[in-house]
């Protein structure tokens, strides 16, 4: 509970960058990217916080303060001030001009002062305004502002992870930090330091110790005058770091007397410029904000909207009546008002019809059967296809009109109704449209119902059009239709549920009228999106990729998920014990290098061990929180500095293997099938590769003995074997095709070992004289260069001097000159078009390809080189899967496709089919694409995945 006593005259001072950074990182795992590929996370988060403040407080006086950039007076005293901070992310740099324009459109003043930070400007403004009788609210999450809190000066702190603000006055600051006065925050920071600003503080003194010292001595000055009262190591730390403590206090002190001219009129908010706001929010695609501020166009409505239940049997003449009654519309009338940009079901004309009787079902089937295409969706009790029960079906054949078939709780009656729709759903002459159709196909499959005909999945269509963005229906409806869909939680009456959502299994408790609208809207909106995407696919020359590769793959993936794979859980349990013993051995080996117990799983303790006690490097890098970096990338670079690092890396690898796979896989076994059923994701990886989840089988390590052992647990069914078919060096073969390099084409055409042949050319020796080490280096170069590897990167990977790595790369390009030309052309094409594409027309967009930031641009250039290769490989294996599936159906094989992992397909094959099926798979995969070099597939057979691979 707040104990503040604010005055009626409030002034709000906002620390812009503190809020901008917070907003940007809040969306880091799921950034907001608009249709132009612009990351709007920082802008959207900042404006939402500003909006909430204005709605809650309606401030008359408000100012937003920016850091000016460049060095300040603190840098003149301490060069290392904020030196550890990473460069401002490119997306934040790009966001600042937009944010400033939006602030101006809100009628709010912007302040910044050369040589001073926003803290100092706000500190000075706060003290002056306090003296003039105002209540000052400093809006920032940063703790250093606590030192400014005083009578009528408050910290107005945005809550993390939820809406609202916490107002901190004197008593709240004292209670939060254990201080007698907010001003002591300066002394607290002086002792404990502040990693975010690289303020060193007193080494070895953390927040707890610093708080106790301030509690005991009152201030740093008093502490330094009474060091004789300290004892032991603490005394040594304080005495030896006296000057650093004083320096840290100086750096932590926010100035309150900088020379800034200020009048209250300058921070008085002016009227908003709604024209500018509309322009900016439209450009940024902030539809929620457009809706919130009612910034839509003024139009004349010719008639009121109808959102009542219509008749199933309405014809164009609107003459028929039925058991399902149609409510009449109001008389048309002219009204002029502002239409919010984001429409909803409440202000959009629609006709959503409930189907309950047998006659209605027959009539609906007749209507759907008379069309060449329809959209459908299932409403179910679970997102798990093995658990889901269908509670309803929705259909649409034209925009703004849809039908909902409500299914009873009775399982037998539900199955009877579904069987009536089966011929329609399985009809190959009728095109089916849906959103995430793999799910609907799987659920209907549980009832013995297939889905036939050409398919159009709006989720996959949007993925091809804009692979980097989100593909859920809610998002797409907002972007392409300016429409806000009904959210599941809104189907329930209580406010708490509306905000937090309800488990999907509670769908049977939803009032039927609401469920009808919700389900019909899904089918209706999906159909409207289909009409938009179909044209866009054509305009982008993506129709063939969509209809010939992506859509035929959908039912195949559904079938693979249903097939699942057997797991030997006893073997995994035994292997878990083996790994635990190995981990204990590594722990003993690590402890042999240290004289004190250590938690090997603690990055903090590992950092202190490596960089403070063992001092393996002079200037170790740190994270934003001031902790030593001990991530895998950092430790890999240091692995030869001390034997303990290799042990730490090995310990981490085994522990991850144990927790992520060995112990986790048995928990994912479906009790109904005794198999694991991974989910294959078609719209996640922008290059077109499939990913898998629950479990993720793409990341099972295969290069080391420990990781390979996990594959042993994937076993064949009784009377069967596992068959693994793996493309050999497919990405290099694609590089040879795309680049047309004669030397590379020749090596593949003659069937040479490509890595040995590469080594012979790089090192300018006969093929017979290539050593194993030379081949290893050439292999690393082969695969590294198609990912745009640098000399530094190659030297790190091969653990060789950079000069030698550079010589290898130079030798590579000298040997394969067309490869270098291809790489340059790919980058140039990306710069010119903003995208690159695969052999089959898949587009991969690169918004950062012309970035002014060299590292950001370099990353985009590497993607420009590799994405067409990786994407083409993804397209090829998808075509192969379609061809193999056709062979299985054509020959009535009992063999089942179970897994797809990168360039490998895994099948469960009855022993009686092995020889014939092996040839069918090999032929289908090797003829999936026609390249200038042959595609080669290695096929293996075994009782488990490891044996087969």
Which residue stretches match the model-derived regions?
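Conserved RNase H-like, two-metal-ion catalytic cores of nucleic-acid enzymes
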Residues: 3-5, 11-12, 22-61, 79-80, ...
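C-terminal polymerase-core module
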Residues: 581, 585-588, 592-646, 814-862, ...
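Noncatalytic, basic helical substrate-engagement surface that gates or grips nucleic-acid strands
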Residues: 2-139, 143-171, 244-247, 253-261, ...
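Conserved "right-hand" nucleotidyltransferase catalytic core of DNA-directed polymerases
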Residues: 241-408, 435, 468, 476, ...
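Conserved catalytic core of nucleic-acid polymerases
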Residues: 502-508, 562, 670-673, 677-678, ...
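Accessory alpha-helical DNA-binding modules that contact the DNA backbone or grooves
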Residues: 182-249, 290, 574-601, 810-813, ...
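Short alpha-helix plus adjacent loop in nuclease-associated cores
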Residues: 80-94, 150-179, 235-237, 403-420, ...
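Short hydrophobic beta-strand that contains or immediately precedes a catalytic carboxylate
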Residues: 13-14, 138-140, 374-376, 455-456, ...
């Amino acid at each position: 509970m707040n104990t503040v006593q604010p005055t009626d005259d409030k002034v709000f001072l906002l620390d812009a960058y503190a809020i901008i950074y917070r907003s940007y990182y809040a969306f880091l795992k799921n950034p907001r990217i608009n249709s132009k590929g612009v990351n709007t996370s920082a802008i959207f988060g900042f404006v939402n916080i500003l909006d909430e403040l204005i709605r809650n407080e309606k401030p008359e006086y408000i100012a937003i303060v920016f850091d000016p950039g460049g060095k300040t007076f603190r840098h003149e005293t301490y060069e290392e001030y904020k030196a550890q901070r990473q460069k401002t992310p490119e997306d934040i740099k790009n966001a600042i001009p937009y944010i400033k324009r939006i602030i101006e459109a809100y009628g709010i003043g912007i302040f910044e002062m050369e040589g001073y930070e926003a803290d100092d400007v706000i500190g000075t403004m706060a003290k002056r305004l306090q003296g003039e009788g105002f209540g000052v609210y400093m809006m920032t999450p940063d703790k250093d502002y606590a030192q400014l809190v005083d009578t009528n000066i408050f910290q107005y702190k945005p809550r993390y992870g939820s809406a609202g603000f916490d107002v901190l006055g004197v008593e709240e600051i004292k209670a939060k930090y254990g201080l007698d006065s907010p001003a002591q925050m300066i002394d607290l920071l002086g002792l404990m330091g502040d990693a975010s600003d690289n303020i060193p503080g007193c080494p070895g003194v953390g927040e707890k110790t610093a708080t106790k010292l301030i509690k005991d001595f009152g201030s740093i000055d008093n502490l330094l005058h009474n060091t004789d009262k300290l004892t032991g190591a603490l005394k040594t730390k304080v005495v030896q770091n006296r000057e650093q403590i004083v320096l840290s206090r100086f750096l932590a002190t926010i100035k309150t007397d900088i020379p800034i001219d200020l009048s209250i009129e300058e921070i008085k908010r002016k009227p908003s410029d709604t024209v500018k706001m509309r322009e900016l929010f439209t450009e940024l695609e902030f539809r929620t904000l457009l809706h919130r501020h009612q910034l839509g166009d003024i139009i004349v409505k010719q008639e009121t909207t109808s959102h009542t239940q219509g008749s199933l049997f309405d014809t164009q003449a609107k003459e028929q009546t039925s058991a399902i009654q149609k409510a009449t519309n109001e008389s048309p009338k002219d009204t002029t008002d502002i239409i919010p940009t984001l429409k909803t079901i409440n202000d959009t004309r629609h006709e959503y019809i409930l189907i309950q009787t047998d006659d209605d079902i027959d009539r609906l089937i007749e209507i759907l059967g008379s069309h060449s295409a329809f959209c459908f969706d299932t409403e179910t009790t679970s997102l798990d296809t093995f658990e889901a029960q269908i509670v309803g079906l929705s259909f649409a054949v034209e925009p703004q009109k849809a039908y909902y078939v409500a299914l009873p709780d009775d399982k037998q009656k539900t199955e009877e109704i579904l069987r009536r729709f089966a011929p329609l759903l399985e009809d190959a002459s009728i095109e089916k449209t849906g959103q995430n159709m793999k799910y609907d196909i799987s659920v209907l499959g549980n009832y013995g119902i297939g889905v036939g005909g050409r398919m159009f999945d709006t989720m996959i269509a949007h993925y091809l059009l804009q692979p980097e963005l989100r593909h859920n229906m809610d998002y797409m409806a907002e972007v392409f239709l300016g429409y806000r869909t009904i959210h599941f939680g809104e189907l329930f009456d209580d406010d708490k549920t509306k905000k937090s959502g309800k488990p999907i299994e509670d769908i049977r408790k939803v009032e039927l009228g609401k469920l009808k609208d919700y389900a019909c809207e899904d089918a209706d909106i999906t159909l409207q999106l289909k009409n938009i995407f179909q044209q866009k696919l054509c305009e982008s020359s993506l129709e063939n990729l969509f209809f010939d590769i992506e859509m035929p793959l959908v039912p195949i993936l559904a079938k693979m998920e249903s097939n699942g794979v057997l797991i030997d859980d006893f073997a995994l349990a035994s292997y878990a014990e083996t790994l635990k013993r190995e981990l204990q051995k590594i722990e003993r080996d690590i402890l042999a290098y240290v004289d004190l117990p250590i938690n090997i799983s603690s990055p903090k303790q590992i950092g202190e061990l490596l960089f403070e006690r063992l001092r393996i490097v002079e200037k170790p890098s740190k994270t934003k929180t001031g902790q030593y970096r001990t991530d895998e990338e950092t430790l890999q670079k240091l692995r030869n500095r001390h034997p303990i690092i290799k042990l730490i890396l090995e310990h981490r690898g085994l522990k991850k293997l144990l927790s992520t796979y060995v112990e986790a896989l048995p928990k994912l076994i479906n009790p109904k099938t005794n198999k694991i059923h991974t989910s294959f994701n078609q719209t996640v990886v922008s290059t077109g590769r499939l990913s898998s989840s629950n479990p993720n089988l793409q990341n099972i390590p295969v290069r080391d003995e420990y990781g390979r052992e996990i594959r042993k647990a994937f076993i064949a069914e009784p009377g069967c074997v596992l068959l693994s078919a793996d493309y050999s060096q497919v990405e290099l073969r694609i590089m040879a095709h795309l680049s047309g390099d004669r030397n590379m084409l020749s090596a593949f055409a003659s069937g040479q070992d490509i890595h040995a042949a590469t080594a012979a050319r790089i090192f300018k020796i006969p093929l017979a004289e290539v050593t194993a080490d030379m081949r290893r280096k050439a292999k690393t170069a082969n695969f590294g260069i198609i990912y745009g590897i640098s000399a530094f990167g190659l030297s790190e990977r091969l653990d060789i001097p950079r000069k030698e790595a550079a010589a290898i790369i130079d030798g590579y390009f000298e040997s394969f000159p067309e490869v270098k030309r291809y790489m340059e052309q790919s980058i140039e094409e990306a710069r010119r078009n903003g995208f690159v594409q695969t052999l089959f027309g898949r587009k991969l967009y690169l918004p950062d390809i012309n970035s002014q930031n060299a590292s950001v641009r370099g990353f985009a250039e590497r993607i420009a080189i590799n994405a067409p290769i990786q994407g083409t490989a993804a397209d090829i294996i998808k075509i192969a899967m379609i061809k193999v599936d056709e062979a299985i159906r054509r020959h009535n094989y009992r063999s089942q496709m179970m897994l797809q992992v990168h360039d490998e397909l895994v099948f469960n094959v009855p022993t009686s089919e092995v020889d014939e099926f092996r040839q069918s798979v090999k032929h289908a995969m090797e003829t999936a694409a026609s390249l200038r070099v042959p595609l080669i597939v290695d096929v293996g057979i075994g009782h488990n995945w490891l044996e087969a691979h």
